[in-house]
Amino acid sequence: MVARRLVKAVAVVLAMSFADTGAAAERISWAVQDFPPFQILDGPAKGTGSFDGLLDLLIARLPHYEHDVVPMTFARREAEIRQGTDLCTPGIFRTPAREPFMEFSAPALLHLDNRVVFRSDRSPRFADGGAVDLEKVLQSKDLVGGVATGRSYAPNIDALIIRYSGYSNLISRPWKSEQFFQMLLAGEVDYIILFPHEANFLAQRFSAQQQVGIRPIAGAPPSIATTVACTRTPLGARIIADINAVIGGALGQPEYRRLSERWYQDSDKDLIRRYYDQMMGVR
């Protein structure tokens, strides 16, 4: 009887031992884009974008997960998440169209509004010095614009892009911002839509500061927040709960605040600091 109990006890201990050693950590597959200056995947500035900094923080603070980083286009990211592939992304806008298939974190990073970027020689066509009525620009048959397929610019801008997506003067391709910027410099498009620090980054990269102009978009909010998002699955929900705990503990810390300021000019950094607490819910 004693021997039988001993055998059972040993069996239980062995089973628990094998269960412990055989349990694999859950895995987060991070979908990242070559999207400077938010995410910079190569070159001298590699890893210095705001999304890069956030991803580094999350990987460091979530050691109980295995982490894979997978470069892909905006369009592929959107398609794979819609198909149910378990992916997460460190920077994305929360939109009604995405809610059925994505789990979103609390606001994670703050950004200034998008701008219309155009060739300087076309300046009179873009509200010379004032805010641009984007819908009027999209309606102008003699102005050709370029937008990235699968990229969300902001809810109000996305709605206009969808409305005019069938127009021949709006080119939509699954390209990087850099490619559209080169098209702009070559005169193949008249305007593109970028964030201000994104436009400045590319203008510096191509030594084109004098060749492009930037205007705000009428009616656009002055700032907008991105979130971290995962595929809407049980795993995605668990990951987002853990990410929210990390973000909630970091939002008010100076080092975390500076992630949102990366690559902005000093005057724009002041604007981000002005909007940060209210937009990000810091108390």
What function would you assign to each model-found segment?
Residues 52-62, 120-131, 142-143, 225-262, ...:
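Extended ligand-binding regions for polar small-molecule ligands
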Residues 26-41, 48, 130-153:
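Short loop->beta-strand "edge-of-pocket" segments that line small-molecule binding or catalytic clefts
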